[in-house]
Amino acid sequence: MDTIFAVSSGLLPSGVAVIRLSGPHVINIVKALCGHLPKARLMHYGNLTARDGSFLDSALTVFFPAPHSFTGEDCAEFHLHGSKAVVNRFLDELSTFDGCRSAEAGEFSRRAFMEGKLDLIQAESLADLIEAETESQRRLAVMGTSGRLTTLYRDWRNRLIKARAFIEAELDFSDEADVSDLISDKVWEDVEELCISIRDHIAQGERANILRDGLKIVIAGAPNSGKSSIMNRLAGKSVAIVMEEAGTTRDALEIRLVLGGLPVFLTDTAGLRETENKIEQLGIEIAKQHIVDADLVILVYDMGNPKEVNLPETSAEIWHVGNKLDLYEEENKKTWTIQFSALTGLNFDYFIKELESFCLRRVSEIGNLFPARKRQLQLLKEAIREIEASINYRSLDLSLHAEHLRCASVFLGKITGDIDVEDLLDIIFSEFCIGK
């Protein structure tokens, strides 16, 4: 097997650049560059020298002998000055060693998986942790790397294997009455409890999609109610055209924000009204589709001239908010639970706090343990289908019951990587950056 290397510390130039090395030739390479092998897991400062005797850099080196390393192989890290020239010269020197090459994306983590240092859930969560942009995404990733999900799924899988073993025992000893009683008393009760637990877990996973994929918030309302001004105020910059002429927004405009620690996709839509303009009609149809798909619809009214609009059927929460608070005298305006001026910012802080509270409320509806990725969720759904098939058709031959439970246990094993998932590995580890 080759020894691999990569810059694992990010873009250059930087204060420090960390070069990671893993594989069977690490010890010889470190000795050649440092002049000796540093003590394991202790940072060593000294000069690094090329094999032709030329000076490379003054650096910190740390050696991690197998199996006590990230990959489970011999590993080393070199902490160099973060100059492009220094790093490129050092990488060139590493490439001169036989069997030593630049790592592919995610190759260090893939080796850690192959050596049993990570399971598949932990590997996916590690990639998510590196990509996390919000606090909710960070917590989601940490949950996966902790191993708690793996423990849960392996426990469920072991319960299915045990149930299947009891069923096969009845097949082998069908003339033994005590064995038959054991099946009816133990197996189905436990399988039904397991089925309920997995169903609840799947429901949690459906709700938890917002942590990874974000909430969809749509700004809707009649033309010229100030929707684009709200968009610009929330974005903190001008992203939507604001004009006195009604109907200037013809398409949906989407931006990404972070509210209450959640990623939020905020969409400004065309004003809803009857029109003969074909282009505007198309924009209104697009707006209606966004409303259908939304988690929250902010229905905006001009407080001095509120116009009702027809919304499509949607499961989203709908807020009726009044805009242009600065333009109208108290006696000439309708009162709204949420009212502000997007143009001047009057009372807009309250609106933002309400949005953050909405996001936090959605997070609070999610439990502490749930599938972190759609791949995991899909395999759980496949497993539950097999379990339900076994439970709902008690008249099935016992061998078919056993087969349904076997298939369910295979799906659970694929989540953690305990069952062969070779076809998935290239996809999963390609998501990693070089050097991880």
Curated annotation (Swiss-Prot):
Entries under SUPFAM superfamilies matching the protein: P-loop containing nucleoside triphosphate hydrolases, TrmE connector domain
GO MF: GTP binding; GTPase activity; metal ion binding
This protein's UniProt keywords: Cytoplasm, GTP-binding, Hydrolase, Magnesium, Metal-binding, Nucleotide-binding, Potassium, tRNA processing
Chief location category: cytoplasm
EC code: 3.6.-.-
HAMAP family: GTPase_MnmE
Residues annotated for Mg(2+) binding in this entry: 228, 249
Function (record text): Exhibits a very high intrinsic GTPase hydrolysis rate. Involved in the addition of a carboxymethylaminomethyl (cmnm) group at the wobble position (U34) of certain tRNAs, forming tRNA-cmnm(5)s(2)U34.
Assembly and interaction partners: Homodimer. Heterotetramer of two MnmE and two MnmG subunits.
Protein known as: tRNA modification GTPase MnmE
Family: Belongs to the TRAFAC class TrmE-Era-EngA-EngB-Septin-like GTPase superfamily. TrmE GTPase family.
Gene Ontology BP terms: tRNA methylation; tRNA wobble uridine modification
Subcellular localization: Cytoplasm
Cofactor note: Binds 1 potassium ion per subunit.
Coiled-coil intervals: none
GO CC, any one term: cytoplasm
Domain TrmE-type G: from-to ranges: 214-360
Cited PANTHER family: TRNA MODIFICATION GTPASE GTPBP3 (PTHR42714), TRNA MODIFICATION GTPASE GTPBP3, MITOCHONDRIAL (PTHR42714:SF2)
Annotated residues for binding of (6S)-5-formyl-5,6,7,8-tetrahydrofolate: 20, 77, 117, 436
Residues engaged in binding GTP: 224-229, 243-249, 268-271
Cofactor field: K(+)
Organism lineage: Bacteria, Pseudomonadati, Pseudomonadota, Alphaproteobacteria, Hyphomicrobiales
